[in-house]
């Protein structure tokens, strides 16, 4: 992605041209408890409340950093939670971009890293050695790398499972394939058809699937596009035409329409359909495992390999992405900021965050040290899927528009039966209109 002028775009980024220079507050030794003479001060903002399991993990990781680097660095964390609409934290960043009051390090939601980099909000990290980089999952490095430069490292990772009810599949005589031989789209349709009489008798559906407004739809279902050889945006992130509206993508959106038409899924959301035993399958985030274990222990849960196109070439395609740490363009101490980013995304911090929230770590060593990812078949399946097949969401400065457009086409074609080419072409017009400022 080429270097772009500082234009701030939708969702977490403003629409006006701004300057990153300004009068930020100077913090002196003694102003903050623990910050002593001779230490490099590093300010950091995170997107959550302090008094939560996630916030407590971040706070403890910072305390451990300050203990390890006592006399060299001092990290000062500030908690700026998001509100229900996703603002709050991003609003604070927007205002601080304009005033020049950004901290040295911020958390960035993974899909927005490209936009923050393109708009000059974050800068490349100081050089990491190959050994340091090899500690991280490929998906973490891929998500954080723009134009061959590493901008961010994940606080955590994520994945989406194709969950199944073991008792229902056993009743139907269906065997689940191994992770390297997932069901194809065609095979999955045959399985759903086989399950339909059983689920009809339970007043349910073979598949618990919805197309929710917001980030979930592209996060859950973009793999259908990727395994079919499609993309939603060009490699440089600057055009959607010929990508979002391709024949390959049209076939995928029509596939979703078929799921609705054949009544393999409900056209309207049904709360706890899978959890109540009235669906055989469900696509959901890794958090679903803990939800089932804690609240629906009567469900014998399994994780099947995420399904693939009949034309899948064996490449990466499964969902990834979560919050990451990045150094802002405000910082004049990139080496210090990078040390904090490495610490907060590293093994010990990842284990601590898992212990508090059950989120998936960013480093291989963290998985090796957390026995759950070896001993629990469901968590193990999610990790292996992430490790072997994880694919980042589209990298583009207008990612929010791509995400919104994907959900709109899913809903309009899948649920309402509108013409797929018309809906895709209209989405391309909207996406490319947002991209014009980056291609002038």
Indicate residue ranges for each PLM-predicted region:
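Bacterial N-terminal signal peptides
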Residues: 9-19
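Alpha-to-beta junction loops
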Residues: 97-108, 121-123, 202, 276-284, ...
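Conserved N-terminal structural module of periplasmic/extracytoplasmic solute-binding proteins
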Residues: 6, 20-115, 130-133, 269, ...
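Hinge/lid segment of periplasmic solute-binding proteins
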Residues: 108-161, 186, 191, 200-203, ...
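Long, aromatic- and glycine/proline-rich binding clefts that accommodate carbohydrate-like moieties
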Residues: 143-144, 297, 304, 355-408, ...
């Amino acid at each position: 992605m080429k270097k772009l002028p500082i234009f701030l775009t939708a969702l977490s980024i403003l629409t006006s041209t701004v300057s990153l220079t300004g009068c930020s507050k100077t913090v002196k030794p003694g102003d903050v408890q623990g910050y002593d003479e001779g230490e490099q001060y590093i300010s950091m903002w995170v997107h959550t409340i302090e008094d939560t399991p996630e916030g407590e993990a971040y706070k403890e990781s910072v305390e451990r950093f300050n203990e390890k680097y006592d006399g060299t660095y001092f990290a000062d964390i500030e908690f700026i939670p998001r509100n229900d609409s996703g603002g709050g934290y991003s609003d604070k960043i927007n205002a601080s971009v304009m005033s020049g009051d950004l901290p040295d390090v911020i958390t960035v939601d993974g899909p927005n890293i490209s936009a923050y980099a393109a708009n000059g909000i974050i800068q490349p990290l100081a050089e990491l050695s190959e050994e340091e980089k090899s500690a991280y999952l490929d998906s973490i490095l891929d998500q954080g790398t723009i134009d061959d430069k590493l901008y961010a490292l994940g606080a955590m990772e994520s994945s989406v499972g194709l969950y199944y009810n073991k008792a229902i599949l056993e009743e139907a005589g269906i065997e689940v394939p191994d992770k390297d031989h997932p069901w194809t789209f065609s095979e999955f349709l045959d399985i759903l058809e086989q399950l339909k009489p059983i689920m009809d008798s339970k007043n349910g559906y073979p598949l618990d699937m919805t197309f929710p407004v917001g980030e979930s739809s592209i996060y859950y279902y973009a793999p259908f596009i990727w395994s079919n050889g499609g993309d939603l945006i060009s490699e440089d992130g600057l055009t959607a035409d010929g990508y979002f509206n391709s024949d390959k993508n049209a076939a995928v959106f029509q596939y979703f329409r078929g799921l609705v038409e054949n009544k393999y899924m409900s056209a309207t959301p049904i709360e706890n359909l899978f959890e109540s035993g009235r669906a055989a399958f469900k696509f959901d985030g890794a958090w679903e495992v803990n939800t089932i274990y804690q609240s629906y222990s009567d469900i014998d849960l399994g994780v099947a390999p995420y399904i693939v196109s009949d034309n899948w070439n064996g490449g990466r395609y499964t969902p990834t992405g979560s919050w990451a740490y990045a150094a802002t363009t405000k910082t004049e101490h990139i080496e210090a900021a990078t040390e904090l980013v490495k610490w907060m995304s590293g093994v010990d911090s990842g284990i601590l965050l898992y212990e508090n929230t059950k989120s998936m770590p960013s480093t291989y060593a963290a998985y090796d040290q957390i026995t759950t990812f070896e001993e629990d078949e469901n968590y193990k399946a999610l990790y292996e899927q992430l490790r072997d097949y994880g694919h980042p969401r589209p990298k583009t400065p207008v990612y929010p528009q791509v995400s919104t457009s994907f959900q709109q086409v899913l809903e309009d074609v899948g649920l309402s039966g509108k013409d797929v080419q018309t809906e895709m072409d209209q989405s391309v017009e909207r996406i490319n209109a947002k991209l014009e400022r980056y291609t002038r």
